[in-house]
C-alpha cells in the first residue's frame, strides 16, 4: 500500500511556503506547543519520510519545518522563529524532498544534470519496503538549538505536500 490523497482540510502554512521555495503547498499538518526549558539547549530526533521518493524528486518538493521561537531567537519565520529542521552540515538548508535524495527522479535517470543527488548520505531508499509505507525517508536527523534556561519557547512542527495533494509525506 501507499499513502496518497488522504482526506484532510487544505490548510496552507505560510512558513512552509517559504521552506518549500515559494511553490504552492497543500494539506499542511501542524503541531504547536509551548515549553519551559530546563537547560541551555534543546534537541529532537526525527525522520522525514515521503511517498514522493524516488519518482518525484526535483518536481514535488514536499517540506518539513521545525520552527522554534522565543527569547534570543530572531529568525525569518512567524514569531521570529528559526527552522531547526536543517540538513546536517548546513546552516539553513531545510529538510525537503529536493534537499535530501539519491538523485533519482520521475525519469529514473540517476545522472540527470537537472536533478543531482542532494545529501544522499542522509537518504534511505525504501521502495518495496514492508514495515514503513513511505518509499524513502531520511536517516535519523537531529534538530538542536541553544536556549535560555527557565524561559518559555514555542515550537511548531509542520509538514506539507507541495504542488499537489497526492503522495503524502510524514
Question: Where would I find each of the regions flagged by the language model?
Answer:
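Aromatic (Trp/Tyr/Phe) and Gly/Pro-enriched flexible surface segments
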Residues: 1-170
